[in-house]
Design a protein with these regions (language model features):
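Vicinal oxygen chelate
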Residues: 2-9, 23-25, 31-32, 41-46, ...
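Hydrophobic ligand-binding cavity/cleft-lining segments
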Residues: 12-23
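Short, conserved charged micro-motifs
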Residues: 16-17, 100-106
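Conserved loop-to-helix junction within protein kinase catalytic domains, corresponding to the end
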Residues: 36-37
């Protein structure tokens, strides 16, 4: 039996980064259930400090997720952590767009707030390493 996988990215602004990556990938931010969140606060299972408002909606402060229109792709969860990123990622995402679209996509992502870090190639393969707005590295290939 296959096991599902969720990708979790530590960050300082989970809702902002979820919005950014949803735009990058053409995915959607997973909606949060405001009524459920209010009920959890009302019953004492959570506190107001566990919540925040993002784009006019009550959401959990600790995280936000994005999902693909393709249900077979993994969910990506952006999780609030207190410390900033300090070293190179041990795991990173590769955004595959193909050689014919790579330069346009890099330009689009830089326009959305990514930072170009370097370009590389190995044999016939070429990619551009970028950083998202919080400094997490990813590649466009």
């Amino acid at each position: 039996m296959a096991t599902d996988v969720q990708i979790v990215i530590d960050c300082a602004d989970p809702h902002g980064l979820a919005d950014w990556w949803a735009e990058v990938l053409g995915w959607q931010v997973e909606p949060q259930d405001e009524a459920f969140i209010r009920r959890m606060v009302t019953t004492g299972a959570a506190t107001e400090a566990d919540t925040t408002t993002h784009r006019g909606a009550l959401v959990w402060r600790s995280g936000a997720a994005i999902t693909s229109p393709d249900p077979h792709r993994p969910r990506v969860l952006f999780q609030l952590v207190p410390e900033a990123k300090t070293v190179k990622n041990r795991v990173h995402l590769d955004v595959h767009v193909g050689a014919d679209r790579r330069e346009d996509e890099v330009g689009r992502l830089v326009g959305l707030g990514a930072t170009e870090l370097h370009r590389a190639s190995q044999g016939p393969f070429e990619w551009v390493t970028l950083a998202d707005p919080e400094g997490n590295e990813f590649c466009v290939a």
